[in-house]
Amino acid sequence: MIQTGALASVLLALMFLTACGRSPTEREQMFLGTIHGDSLDYSRMRLVEGAPLRAVTFRRPQRPRVTCRERIVPPRPAGEMVTASPAALALFNRIFFTREWFLPDYTPEYPDALHLVEAMLLAHEATHVWQWQNRKLTGYTPLKALREHSTSPDPYLFDVNGPADFLAYGYEQQGTIVEEYVCCRALAPKAARTRRLHDMLAKVMPVSDLPQSREQDVYLPWKDATVNGICD
């Protein structure tokens, strides 16, 4: 479970941070446009380097290796608890990345190729900005999202066979669902889960049509990842 006191302190500090950050690049906007379309105002969105998140850590059980996002990385020893630290944090229209994870472009070769992990991270955090900009629909506030970390050992975990109502999930789960959609669309656009996720998202945002085949080359974080059947 995440240290919510430390995370709350970070949120408070970021609220007073005056760093402007950068706008999404043209490639990033093109990529995010396939998910959020015009329901996200990219002109108001800023990506900022230097989120003070090193002191924020959380321990969680291993997640089942049934999702695309879990199967593109190496397995961990059975029963091992996972200790991690956030790579980024979204606050209103700004996304604060740790220095290790801040990049000048998260989609540098798009649409010809996709750096999958970087694109998934961007899509997850952009979904929090979408939640804020569409808060009349989502009911989102940063404090509500923060509370999820004190009530669940893993607020990002979702059931791949769960409800088809996107807004029925927690805010971090919604970001993770978008990550999973990016992963499945990139690697298995005709798979059953890809279609389910697409149909779920299409109810709340103007997600673009699914392609009939893979749209671009995909850079994976693990060379031994098995792509066949990854989103069935």
Give each language-model segment a name.
Residues 1-3:
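N-terminal secretory signal peptides that target proteins for export/translocation
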Residues 5-18:
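Bacterial N-terminal signal peptides
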Residues 27, 33, 83, 90-92, ...:
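Metalloprotease/metallohydrolase-associated module, dominated by Zn2+-dependent proteases
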Residues 126-143:
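Catalytic Zn2+-binding segment of zinc metalloproteases
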